[in-house]
Every structure is written in structure tokens, then in C-alpha cells.
Amino acid sequence: MLGIAAAMLAVSATQNTARANCRPDGQDDNIMRNAILSEMIAKQQTCQLDSRPHKVLCIGNSITLHLPSNAVNWYSSQGMAASKPELDYCHVLEKLMRQHNRKTTVTPVNIADWERNPSLSLDSLLRDKCQGKDIIVIRIGENVQPDGVANFEKNLAALIDYCKGFTGKIVLTGEYWPHVQKELAIVRNAHKYGLRYVPIDWIWNLYREECSPKEGDTLYDVNGKPYTIKGQFILTHPNDKGMELIAKSIYSIL
């Protein structure tokens, strides 16, 4: 697996792929993003977890947790498209962190509705989940709609401010599906608040084939019964390998 520095370099090297998703002046966004990243990577060192039990909250979307939905032929309750709960990135992250303390827990929460409609109350969505957590991972952005991209930086800042009311240790990940403007909004917030940040779009850019599920692949439903992937919605999400790389990327900077 690529290290954090190598991953950031990979992101910079694959910007042409991401540019298709940004506005005409996206090249300026790339220059700004890389300048901020260069400063951040010089300061950002791998942190060694202590032996205390940690309570981690992963705030995300369908990549973090998706409940069963007949509408998209998804009958599981984990990060989409992990084949089993224990193989999504939150469970893999928990397993990695339990090497330091077996009582560490990682809890997922899906706020995709807030991504699409940031006027929703964060307190209603997150208060109970955030209570008692000492690490919060914010892993969002893919569901921000085109008309919401311009305000994503401001809305993400509001989410960070809310989470800071519960813990000072907040980690931001980048986008899984490359999008330069959204990524820059995340990087700027990480820089502004002095937060740890890890890009993950290099997984999609460099390892899309091996990290994406295929139609007909086997998944397991909430009762452990196998079923096969049908339809396009699940196919764009990370499979077990992609989930593992996301988990290891987050773990490497905790």
C-alpha cells in the first residue's frame, strides 16, 4: 500500500483525471491545492496511537454505512459495497486500532441527507452519536450536489465546528470519487483548523479495477445469506480491497 506521502504525490500526478469534474479554472484549484498540501505534508507526521481505548465516530455517507434498500438491490447493513460488515472500512479501522487496545470502538453514521441538504440540523443528526467520542473522522462530500459545491467549504466548516464541541481530535479524508473543487474545500478546512487530512482519491485513480465490485459479485445480507450485485448503484463503491485501503489510510495518520 502507498504511504501518505506517496498517496499525496499520486493525487498530484493524477489531476488530469479529476479535472474533468471541475470548472474551467480547475487548473488554478489544482495549483492552490498542491501548494497547501506541500505545506501540510511537511508538518503532518504519522501519529502513534497510545494504549488507551478510543471511541471513534466515522461521519460519512453510503461508503461508511448504507442500510438495506430494495430500490438499489442492497440487502446489507454496512459500508457499500463491502461483502460483509467486518470488511467495510469502519470495521477494518476498528480491527487495526484494536492492536493498541482491544476495547477501542469505531461507530459509523450516515449523513448523506445532510450532504444534499446542509440546512438539516446537525444536532438532530449527530448529537447522540458524537457524545463521548474522542476521535471523529469526517468522510463526506460525494453526495454534495453540483449546486452545492460552491458552499461545500463553508458547510464543511460548520460540521467541523460542531464536532469540535465534542473532541479536538478530528480527521478529514478526501473524496473517493475525484473532484478537484470538493477536495480543495476539504484541504482548505484541514489547513484552516490544523486537522489531519488524508487523500483517498488515489485509490480510485490508480486501483479502480481491483477496488471496484463487479456485477455478479457475492455480497451477504443482514442474515448472512449470499446474494449477487445487480444494477449500477453499488458498482461505483469500494469493494473489500478498496475499503481496506481507506481504513489503512485513515489509520496511518491517527
Regions found by a protein language model. Name each.
Residues N16, N21, N30, N34, ...:
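Detector for Asparagine
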Residues E39-M40, D50, K55-L57, L65-V149:
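Conserved SGNH/GDSL esterase-like catalytic core that processes O-acyl groups on lipids
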Residues M1-I59, I63-A82, Q99, H179, ...:
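N-terminal secretory targeting modules
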Residues L120-I253:
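Alpha-helical cap/lid subdomain in secreted, periplasmic
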Residues M1-T17, Y89, W114-E115, D128-I136, ...:
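Generic low-polarity alpha-helical segments
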Residues C22-A35, P85-M97, P118-R127, W177-R188:
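Short, charge-rich amphipathic segments
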Residues T104-V109, W114, M243-L254:
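Extended amphipathic secondary-structure runs
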